């Protein structure tokens, strides 16, 4: 929904436009832009990219929506990436957080392969910031990391920091008390 935040407007505080997703059960989570300061660097190859598209992951469905918000009062779905494409090109599921970066759009996931997302570890994949095609996985070697959550990087030092949360069975239907007490949720950061 688009809410009017212009204080002098007659529709201030009201919903002035909506975009309805064509499917149910996606559970939208941690949206992000196609362009930001990390992607607009002259060294990135797309220094003049327009901050126009909102990337919205469906954490339960593994579907990703690309919303064109150039005109917020006419926002619309530009593209939908279906779960099968995410699985096929990355081996990951449950996309969680979107960050734009120097090589494209980075997407952290909470699930790996398999129906419940636990047959392989989750991770990060990259999408092209102009075509929104999935390029592939980011990690060359994830080391011992078997859970994932959010991430950010120190570009001048050329390293990424990522955190852990839990695997899909540990959050999709609420916290699992035994896992919480047993220390089975994520509690590390990785560099």
Model-predicted segments: where are they?
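Short, conserved, GDST-rich strand-edge loop motifs in beta-rich repeat architectures
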Residues: 1, 42-52, 56-57, 108-120, ...
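Beta-propeller blade signature
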Residues: 2-3, 120-132, 180-191
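Short loop/turn positions that demarcate and connect the beta-strands within blades
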Residues: 16, 22-25, 90-92, 143-146, ...
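Structural signature of eukaryotic scaffold interfaces centered on beta-propeller domains
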Residues: 27-50, 91-102, 151-158, 167
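Beta-propeller domains
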Residues: 1-37, 47-49, 56-82, 119, 141-191, ...
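Asp-box/WD-like beta-propeller blade repeats and closely related beta-sheet repeat scaffolds
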Residues: 69-155
């Amino acid at each position: 929904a688009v809410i009017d935040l212009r204080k002098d407007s007659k529709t201030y505080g009201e919903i002035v436009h909506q975009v309805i997703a064509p499917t149910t059960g996606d559970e939208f989570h941690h949206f992000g832009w196609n362009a930001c300061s990390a992607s607009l660097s002259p060294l990135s190859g797309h220094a003049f990219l327009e901050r126009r598209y909102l990337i919205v992951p469906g954490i339960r469905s593994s579907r990703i929506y690309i919303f064109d918000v150039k005109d917020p009062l006419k926002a619309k779905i530009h593209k939908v990436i279906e779960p099968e494409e995410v699985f096929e090109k990355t081996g990951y599921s449950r996309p969680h957080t979107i960050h734009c970066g120097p090589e494209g759009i980075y997407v952290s996931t909470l699930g790996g392969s398999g129906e419940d997302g636990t047959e392989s570890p989750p991770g990060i994949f990259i999408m092209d910031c102009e075509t929104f095609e999935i390029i592939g996985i980011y990690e060359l070697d994830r080391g011992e990391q078997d859970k994932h959550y959010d991430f950010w990087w120190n570009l001048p030092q050329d390293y990424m920091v990522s955190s852990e949360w839990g695997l899909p069975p540990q959050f999709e239907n609420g916290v699992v008390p035994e896992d919480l007490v047993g220390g089975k949720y994520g509690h590390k950061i990785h560099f």
